[in-house]
From Swiss-Prot:
Taxonomic superkingdom: Bacteria
Protein name per its UniProtKB record: Ferrochelatase
Organism per entry: Dechloromonas aromatica (strain RCB)
Compartment annotation: Cytoplasm
Reactions it catalyzes: heme b + 2 H(+) = protoporphyrin IX + Fe(2+)
Pfam families: Ferrochelatase
Lineage of producing organism: Bacteria, Pseudomonadati, Pseudomonadota, Betaproteobacteria, Rhodocyclales
Cystine bridges: none
Family: Belongs to the ferrochelatase family.
Amino acid sequence: MPRFLPEPPHRHGNPATTAVVLVNLGTPDAPTAPALKRYLKEFLSDPRVVEIPKPVWWLILNGIILNIRPKKSAAKYASVWMPEGSPLRVHTERQAKLLKGLLGQRGHHLTVTSAMRYGSPSIPEVLAHLKAEGAKRILLVPMYPQYAASTTATVVDEAANWLTKIRNQPEMRFVRNFHDHEGYLAALEKSVRQHWQTNGSLGDNDRLLISFHGLPKRSLDLGDPYFCECHKTGRLLAERLNLKPEQFQICFQSRFGKAEWLQPYTAPTLHEWGSKGVRRVDVICPGFVADCLETLEEIAQEGRDDFLKAGGKEYHYIPALNEDDAWIKALADIAEQHLGGWSTKTAFDPHALETSAREAFKFGARA
């Protein structure tokens, strides 16, 4: 088997284009048990996601989880599925389209597309397509505001693995995080204030719950900065909203398994608040820039049930940033910052490219 993937012949006179790729977690292709089984197998087989000895985890995953979870998860996905497909994929594709338009308005000549770490379109598929189209410079933007080894790092891993198979590699850059980016925080603040304009501000007996996806506590103990970056995002957002400490709480959702995860946990907090007389809860999930199963089902549906059944009176989920104009502007600012030094504002001159190719051939270059 060849060490490298087949490479098209080098062609003189082709423009060196630039591409931006928005990368999110991933999604099954359909809200069905078979599709969920394929997706979960890929996702939960990533050693960045599950740090358990491989032989032990293989038995648990293939013997138990993949025989139980797909059917249950399929029903949950079906409850949030959009006519166009999975919410996460739909919103990410829309974000890429809007980002391309805004960067174009700012004078950039580049391609903007999206990829998924698990499922399709995969990172290798998208990178291979961009390379075939002539991309020589690629900026990957993992859509995770807070860095974690199980999210951002595995995107870098997958892209780097693809690069090891490429003879003629493009330049590649990665955005590490943007948890304290001014534009991102401003977009979050705007979404909360717009919600309050419609539903009223928080009263004395109301709370804002700032919920992030959870990780095993072991990740923090081993040096992962995710917990600290989540707290910084939550604290800065609360400051912008002029909230007192007793008016908000940072929590972590989606606990899986019996191990201790980052705390406090979202679901028990909602239950406790409802049982202790908190009247209203507004929930925002800053770690998700596009709505998905974890926000639309776990928070918007299950969270509401937990709080109201425990005695709460009013519950609101504040949607993810999705296609909000302030967020797309922030995303463009983030992309521009990391595109620095790459020539993206100069239109290609076909005559100059043709002349360059002609000169190369004159001095013996291969056609």
